[in-house]
Amino acid sequence: MAAAADAAIASRARERLIPARDAAARALEEAREDEAQWLELEEKISHLRSRAVPDDGFDALVDVGGGVHARGRATSASRVFVDVGLGFRAEMTLEEAETRARRGAERARDDGERARRELEEIGRVMGDVVDYLRSASTVGGG
């Protein structure tokens, strides 16, 4: 009787904890990728601000979609277009873009920290289930 109850506990734990662990691991990886992208944007903006841009602009490679770039002429470096999600780009000053990048990186860090804590908690619960099942099998004569 106890063995059937233990098997049910193990089965229920597998059904719930493993998918939750996998989802938390994916969330952590996505948060790390997001943070890296925001930090890269912040670095590019900083580089653009530090360049001495001539009054008549500068040549640049322009992303035209699908991984294709074309040579273009940027007439000003004071405003940039930032991907704000869902395929939308917003025109911003360098200061606005830098603030957006900083906030995005902070949000991604917070999301990653939440996912990391959730992963740790799931790991603790999984360990508790394993410990319980081991002790139950020892007490039950297994």
For each predicted feature, which ranges?
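Intrinsically disordered, low-complexity regulatory regions in eukaryotic proteins
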Residues: M1-G142
